[in-house]
Curated annotation (Swiss-Prot):
Similarity annotation: Belongs to the protein kinase superfamily. CAMK Ser/Thr protein kinase family. SNF1 subfamily.
Domain Protein kinase: 25-280
Cofactor or coenzyme needed: Mn(2+)
Gene symbol of the encoding locus: CIPK7
UniProt-recorded name of the protein: CBL-interacting serine/threonine-protein kinase 7
Residue ranges, annotated region (PPI): 330-363
Xref: PANTHER family: CALCIUM/CALMODULIN-DEPENDENT PROTEIN KINASE KINASE-RELATED, PROTEIN KINASE DOMAIN-CONTAINING PROTEIN
Amino acid sequence: MESLPQPQNQSSPATTPAKILLGKYELGRRLGSGSFAKVHLARSIESDELVAVKIIEKKKTIESGMEPRIIREIDAMRRLRHHPNILKIHEVMATKSKIYLVMELASGGELFSKVLRRGRLPESTARRYFQQLASALRFSHQDGVAHRDVKPQNLLLDEQGNLKVSDFGLSALPEHLQNGLLHTACGTPAYTAPEVISRRGYDGAKADAWSCGVILFVLLVGDVPFDDSNIAAMYRKIHRRDYRFPSWISKQAKSIIYQMLDPNPVTRMSIETVMKTNWFKKSLETSEFHRNVFDSEVEMKSSVNSITAFDLISLSSGLDLSGLFEAKKKKERRFTAKVSGVEVEEKAKMIGEKLGYVVKKKMMKKEGEVKVVGLGRGRTVIVVEAVELTVDVVVVEVKVVEGEEDDSRWSDLITELEDIVLSWHNDIM
């Protein structure tokens, strides 16, 4: 990668001064551009970290009606930033005329470019990328976010060659559902499910599953399964399943693709189902597959501090981004226990397993010994923390630290804890 311009030495010839963005980032070369935004390589002045900065022209987005897409992209990336295979958003800044999205740098470029260079990928390589894609999309679906534009150009690679899903500008968030279904045609035709193009109400997760089937075909074959300059003819092929598998694709991979490219979304193989197949599980790096979300939340990392949007909210730009960065009040209860910290820990572990959470224990030292049990399910992480103030006094805090837990599950958890409660403190519901 090209290095960014360095401050010039007094003895060196005069050069164009590096452009410093709002005193925080040194802008480098352009990485790409579109009709209303461009992306630059940049370096953090504070940390020296290389990042990508998407520079969005406010006037163009307002005139073209693209502001809802910008809002969705920011909100989706904010919600999903803890998954290792989803491109992270670090910070949002703004001036009177521009919005700056500071994002993780995917220095490996587009997966699409890799496929173009090689023609097709070995099945083991294609499977690894597909595993990471499925993991990222399942994570987003569990948080109610459907991507709706899954294609190789939106699948980036970091310097280690790991997949990073990007461009959530067409994503649908839970509040955009009507009767549980989406109703807007989005995406790129060759990768878009037939029910989306027909503008019927559709399940965003099932539509993403279709796109994943096309992606897997492209990785293994080097071409799309349905390709016709006449869109109507292409969709007739889709409904007839009119495509052919090359001889080098394994029987298991063919079966998965065939089931994911089912034109009927009701009978189409879901991402959850494909992740249970033996083909998918082969060579799966389990530790990598499940890492990141759980550990980061058990360690009580801030869920909002990486995004600063005060400027966005206060500017008279026509873009109303207020509310995107207001952290919702999390469920939390506190009580004095009638048992020891160790017993609280064991009880929390037992309850978590009973109620279907993934359980992780941890011990920390503060002023006294602190027992921490993390309970994870989908996008939601709950922490049970027991602090031994004295030998006889143990205070326990139960709180949702990431995602949201529905009222019935939260009530079940609190009810299960009742038999170790000596007294409840003032509650934060």
